[in-house]
UniProtKB/Swiss-Prot annotation:
Protein's UniProt name: Leukocyte receptor cluster member 8 homolog
Primary gene name: leng8
Polar residues bias spans: 252-261, 360-387
Basic and acidic residues composition-biased segments: 338-352
Lineage, top ranks: Eukaryota, Metazoa, Chordata, Craniata, Vertebrata
Organism per entry: Xenopus laevis (African clawed frog)
Region listing for Disordered, in residue ranges: 118-149, 175-229, 245-273, 335-394, 407-519
Length: 800
């Protein structure tokens, strides 16, 4: 076998097996068994003692399956099958008593009776056996990358066959991920099984590359099966490669480079930096650390040197796994300048300026290329409407050929492809979903990194196969993806937050309010509007009259009331002695002339002068009590209510005045307005001294009769009202008389005398009672209106 390594390629063999290249059916010419195979079987039979019994059975039938086991962290079984060629029938497959299978390789048609092909395509395996021992390839369908070239990339396949009669599907076998040094070789084992004739399924046709003919993918020249070269070639970097292309295709250039590097270097250094070993231990497509460029090794050491804690080292290790794996996968690790490559995590932590939801975000890369992302205005579905990638920049260097912006589907990936490898860092990142960065930047470091991993992992699972419309197949992963997207929309503040363009201006404006807070206060020079006793606090502009000390010097007895529009002039403000004279004049004038308009204007001007000078004395109480009595007499309950509010505040300052009288007025006013809340509060704050007051006692008795609907007692107390309580009772006396009349008509039958109504409802005379009953449309008995027919009057009670 060692002599075969140096033999040149047999030209006759090449002409013989290349004669059918241009055939349309892709069939092979008759061939004879290679005598070198018998030598290989004998050599393997002497080594494999564990499977001697099965090997003897295989030698009797003339059919052998060679299995080479390379224990590099996990058992990798390589199977090869050989079967006889029926040359008398002029085809390369066994005669199965029906038409030839795989005659038209380009058609994707089902097998016999509408079923898929029973025999799948075989992949020839070339394994190394302790040094220079090699075996020629099986004349079956090889991997599309195994052509006559200087660099050969044998693909290691996981052996899924455990029984002798179990069929092996080579086309669906996943590539074994080797994460340890290829130099640690183990003893190979061989086993032979029963004949297992394989034939390519018609459904596997689209998965093979179309650039090579069938013979070039199947054959090696005799004696050249173990002839290998160790010339490394930098794979072609495809500029228009999609993000997820390397994840969905098994025969990518990155895998060929990785597998060729593992198989062509049997001798490796036993010692290596522990940090680099950690990075390549779980990598699925990365090459050996010895084959890395020197600048790339120095870059890794620089990254770990910059770490300050163990957490930083762990984070850096995770980032380097992704960055280096992506670089080695697309071949850019040999082309980029590692000395200028930014350290992972250092360039992604800066916040980018916040963009609006519908605004295009442009990312500048290190090589001058740009990535433009248009954010979708709605959550859910595809989060990216347009993503334009020009060239390769730092963003692609960080994440490799993965579309981190796609949530549930990728328009650039193939429709029926499925990822056949799972990232080793899949599960740990699920713990960090609740610790994403809440930065304002839509593409901050932590948020982009974690979000990109989550979205990419979701696209790789079962629920990640979505069509272009955003609807996926009904699988188990779909519900979890939808639940996660709903949960992400609720807790992700970036997707729903709108930028306030005046945010900074408002902050500066708020900060400017406190710049001069400790300085001396100055008088307000702008015009002011002051309304005395106005319930709207904005009308007086929140003036603090305690700090504005004004002493008036005006001697005018009368003064027109004007609302203040500026700081008051002392020459227009009257002092207290002048105000006392003015109050005496107003009382006399109102008593004689009953001119309420003039009296109210003068009383309001007196109150204004007292307010601007900050005077709150017994004289102030007298002024407000006088104004309240005048307003109560004339029925101006709005002005009376304002005076009552000021009097309550003045009484709370222990200023002398008619506290009992106006407390009774306040109780009666609450009965008038039916304000039960304030009435209850007022009753709760009554002291024993106030309850003993005649006015307060009368008001409490009246309130009790009103609450019990005891109209007889109510109108009896109405006739006995002290001081000016009768004026307040007059406000709601008519309302209570109507309620009492309804109760009387319902109670008395058949007739109700009008004289009885007059006495019970506290009318002064019969004429006043008739004027009250006339608008009510009551029915009277007889021609005179002296008696009310209660039965007939029931119909008009709802209108009263």
């Amino acid at each position: 076998m060692a002599a075969n390594l140096g033999e040149p390629i047999n030209n006759e063999w090449v002409q013989q097996y290349n004669s059918g290249v241009n055939r349309e059916s892709g069939m092979e010419l008759p061939m004879q068994e290679n005598p070198e195979w018998e030598k290989a079987r004998q050599a393997l039979a002497s080594i494999s003692k564990a499977n001697a019994t099965s090997a003897d059975k295989g030698s009797e039938s003339g059919q052998t399956n060679s299995q080479f086991v390379s224990q590099q962290g996990e058992a990798i079984l390589q199977q090869q099958q050989y079967y006889q060629w029926y040359s008398q029938y002029n085809y390369s497959y066994p005669y199965n008593y029906y038409y030839q299978m795989n005659m038209y390789n380009g058609y994707n048609t089902p097998g016999q009776y509408g079923m898929p092909g029973n025999y799948q395509s075989m992949s020839s395996q070339s394994g190394q056996h302790q040094g220079n021992l090699a075996q020629p390839p099986v004349p079956g369908l090889e991997d599309s990358s195994m052509s006559y070239s200087n660099v050969q990339s044998p693909v290691s396949l996981c052996n899924t066959q455990t029984a002798s009669h179990q069929q092996v599907n080579h086309s669906m076998t996943k590539p074994c991920i080797q994460g340890r040094n290829a130099g640690n070789q183990s003893n190979p084992h061989s086993s032979s099984n029963q004949p297992n004739y394989s034939q390519q399924s018609f459904n596997e046709g689209p998965k093979q590359k179309k650039g090579q003919q069938l013979w070039n993918r199947m054959k090696h020249a005799p004696g050249s099966g173990g002839f290998k070269f160790n010339i490394q070639k930098r794979p072609l970097v495809m500029a228009n490669q999609n993000f997820a292309s390397s994840e969905h295709h098994d025969n990518s250039a990155g895998q060929q480079q990785q597998q060729a590097t593992h198989m062509h270097h049997p001798l490796q250094q036993p010692q290596q930096q522990p940090t680099i070993e950690k990075i390549t231990e779980h990598g699925n497509n990365s090459s050996k650390p010895e084959d890395w460029p020197q600048a790339m090794k120095e870059y890794v050491q620089r990254c770990f040197t910059s770490c300050e804690s163990e957490e930083d080292k762990d984070r850096t290790e995770k980032l380097l796994k992704e960055v280096l794996q992506a670089r080695l996968q697309d071949g850019s690790a040999y082309t980029i300048d590692w000395s200028r490559e930014p350290l992972p995590g250092k360039d992604g932590g800066k916040e980018s300026p916040k963009k609006k939801r519908w605004e295009q975000t442009t990312l500048q890369t290190s090589h001058g290329s740009t990535i433009t992302i248009t954010q979708s205005p709605r959550g859910g579905g595809n989060s990216t409407n347009a993503a334009t990638l020009r060239g390769r920049g730092s963003f692609i260097k960080k994440f490799g050929n993965r579309n981190v912006f796609m949530k549930e589907s990728s328009s650039s990936s193939s429709a029926g492809s499925r990822s056949r490898s799972r990232s080793p860092s899949h599960s740990p990142h699920r713990r960090y979903r609740r610790s994403d960065s809440d930065s304002d930047s839509a593409y901050s470091g932590n948020e982009t990194r974690d979000g990109g991993r989550r979205n990419f992992q979701k696209a790789r699972g079962r629920g990640g196969h979505m069509d272009r419309g955003g609807r996926g197949r009904l699988q188990k992963g779909k519900r979890s993806d939808q639940a996660f997207s709903k949960k992400n929309r609720k807790k992700n503040p970036v997707a729903m937050e709108l930028e306030d363009p005046e945010k900074e201006f408002k902050k500066e404006k708020r900060a400017a309010r406190f710049q001069h807070g400790h300085g001396p206060k100055k008088l307000r020079m702008e015009p002011l509007v002051l309304q005395i006793n106005n319930m709207d606090p904005s009308a007086a502009d929140n003036l603090d009259w305690d700090e504005i000390k004004i002493v008036g010097n005006s001697q005018d007895i009368t003064k027109h009331y004007l609302r203040l529009t500026c700081a008051p002039d002392p020459s227009t403000v009257r002092p207290v002695p002048v105000l006392k004279k003015s109050l005496t004049m107003v009382k006399a004038d109102f008593k004689n002339k009953q001119d309420y308009v003039f009296a109210c204007e003068q009383m309001k001007s007196i109150r204004q002068d007292l307010t601007v000078q900050g005077i709150r004395t017994e004289f102030t109480v007298e002024v407000y009590e006088t104004h309240a009595r005048i307003a109560l007499e004339k029925g101006d309950h709005e002005e009376f209510n304002q005076c009552q509010a000021q009097l309550k505040s003045l009484y709370a300052e222990n200023l002398a005045g008619n506290v009992g009288e106006f407390t009774a007025y306040r109780i009666l006013y609450y009965i008038f307005t039916k304000n039960s809340g304030d009435l209850t509060t007022e009753l709760a704050h009554l002291t024993k001294e106030l309850k003993a007051d005649a006015c307060v006692a009368h008001a409490l008795s009246l309130r009790e009769a009103w609450a019990l609907s005891n109209y007889h007692r109510f109108f009896k107390l109405y006739r006995q009202a002290p001081r000016m309580s009768g004026y307040l009772i007059d406000k709601f006396a008519e309302r209570e008389r109507k309620a009492a009349l309804k109760a009387m008509i319902k109670t008395f039958r058949p007739l109700l005398p009008v004289s009885f109504v007059q006495s019970e409802l506290a009318f002064a005379n019969e004429e006043e009672c008739q004027s009250f009953l006339a608008p009510l449309s009551l029915v009277y008995a007889g021609n005179d209106a002296s008696q009310i027919d209660c039965k007939l009057s029931l119909a008009v009670l709802p209108n009263i």
